[in-house]
């Protein structure tokens, strides 16, 4: 337990330090050790300070990856997008575009829920493939798109099934009579 206190004390020392190089090296160290929460906390402070320096690209990419590795996919996608918009020809642009799409893919809900984020994920992955058609990650991106499209098809099926089930529901006589007169809306959903 002594190592834990030393570690916490060391982390607090890093947070309180005014030496940005020291903080950046500590953030890289935490990132390398898989301590993404600590890395992201430090990098959040540093990205504006490091803007315009040689460490700016790497710090923004590491911040995005820190959130990605913590499972905060929306924040990760935001920072990946910020990276590739700021550095369109940057060192990590291909990875940032790919991981932005993958982060949105991982954040999509189950088919019965609203699928707005699924459309965003498809769009982001298609943009990745447009910008990097020869990427070694192209096949993975295509598989994610197919998976997302399957999710949308399942959503449409569930919606159509719901309309069909409502149309054949016999508990409400006036509703059922109205459906017989006006027709079942099921076919309009297909």
List PLM regions with ranges:
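Acidic, polar-rich low-complexity tracts and alpha-helical solenoid repeat scaffolds
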Residues: 4-190
């Amino acid at each position: 337990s002594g190592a834990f206190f030393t570690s916490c004390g060391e982390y607090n020392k890093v947070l309180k330090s005014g030496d940005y190089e020291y903080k950046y090296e500590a953030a890289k160290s935490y990132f390398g050790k898989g301590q993404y929460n600590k890395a992201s906390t430090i990098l959040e402070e540093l990205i504006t300070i490091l803007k315009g320096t040689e460490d700016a690209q790497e710090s923004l990419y590491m911040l995005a990856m820190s959130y990605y590795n913590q499972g905060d996919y929306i924040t990760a996608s935001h920072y990946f997008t910020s990276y590739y918009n700021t550095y369109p020809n940057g060192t990590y642009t291909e990875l940032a575009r790919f991981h932005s799409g993958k982060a949105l893919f991982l954040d999509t809900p189950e088919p019965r829920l609203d699928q707005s984020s699924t459309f965003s994920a498809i769009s982001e992955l298609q943009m990745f493939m447009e910008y990097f058609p020869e990427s070694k990650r192209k096949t993975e991106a295509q598989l994610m798109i197919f998976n997302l499209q399957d999710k949308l098809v399942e959503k449409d099926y569930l919606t159509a099934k719901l309309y069909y089930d409502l149309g054949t529901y016999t508990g409400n006589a006036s509703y059922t009579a109205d459906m017989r007169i006006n027709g079942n809306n099921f076919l309009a959903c297909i």
